[in-house]
C-alpha cells in the first residue's frame, strides 16, 4: 500500500482551507491546513509536506515571507509550492520578490478541478531529499 502524498494548505480564509482540503482529501491525499503562515511553518517542520498550496495575502507574514522562511530550511529548499493569489496583477510587488524561490503562481478564483490538477503538477516536481543535507 502506498503512502498518500501530504499536502499543506496555508490560507487565512477558512472557506478556502475547507474547500481545498475536502477536494484533495477526496482525491486520496493526506491534507493539513494552517490558517496563518506561522502555523504553516510549524506544520511543515512537524509533518513535512510533499507539496504546499499557499495564499499570497495574509496578515503579519505574507506568502512570500513564508516561502523565504521555508526555503531557509534545507529539508524544504525544493518542496513544490504554489502561491495562490486573488490579485489579478502579475506586477504585484509581493510577487516580484519571488525571484529564485521556486514557486508556481496561480490566480483565484480556482475551480476544484484546477486545484487538483495544480496539486498533481506540484507533486510531479518533487525531488528526493539528499540524506546528507537533512
Spans of features found by a protein language model:
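Active-site residues of response regulator receiver
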Residues: 11, 55
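Charged docking surfaces used in two-component/phosphorelay signaling
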Residues: 18-26
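Helix N-cap/capping motif at the beta->alpha junctions
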Residues: 33-42, 63
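Short amphipathic alpha-helix used as the core "switch/output" element in two-component signaling
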Residues: 42, 64-77
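Active-site beta3 strand of CheY-like receiver
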Residues: 47-53
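Receiver (REC) domain active-site loop signature in two-component systems and cognate sites
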Residues: 58
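Alpha4 helix (beta4-alpha4-beta5 surface) of REC/receiver domains from two-component response regulators
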Residues: 65, 88-106, 112-113, 117
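Hydrophobic/aromatic residues positioned on beta-strands within the core alpha/beta folds
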Residues: 84-86
Amino acid at each position: 500500500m502506498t503512502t498518500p502524498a501530504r499536502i499543506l494548505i496555508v490560507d487565512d480564509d477558512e472557506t478556502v482551507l475547507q474547500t481545498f482540503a475536502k477536494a484533495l482529501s477526496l482525491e486520496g491525499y493526506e491534507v493539513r491546513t494552517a490558517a496563518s503562515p506561522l502555523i504553516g511553518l510549524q506544520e511543515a517542520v512537524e509533518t513535512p509536506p510533499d507539496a504546499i498550496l499557499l495564499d499570497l495575502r495574509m496578515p503579519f507574514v505574507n506568502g512570500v515571507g513564508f516561502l523565504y522562511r521555508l526555503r531557509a530550511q534545507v529539508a524544504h529548499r525544493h518542496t513544490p509550492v504554489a502561491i495562490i493569489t486573488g490579485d489579478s496583477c502579475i506586477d504585484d510587488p509581493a510577487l516580484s520578490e519571488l525571484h529564485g524561490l521556486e514557486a508556481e503562481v496561480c490566480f483565484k478564483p480556482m475551480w476544484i478541478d484546477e486545484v487538483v490538477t495544480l496539486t498533481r503538477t506540484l507533486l510531479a516536481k518533487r525531488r528526493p531529499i539528499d540524506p546528507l543535507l537533512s
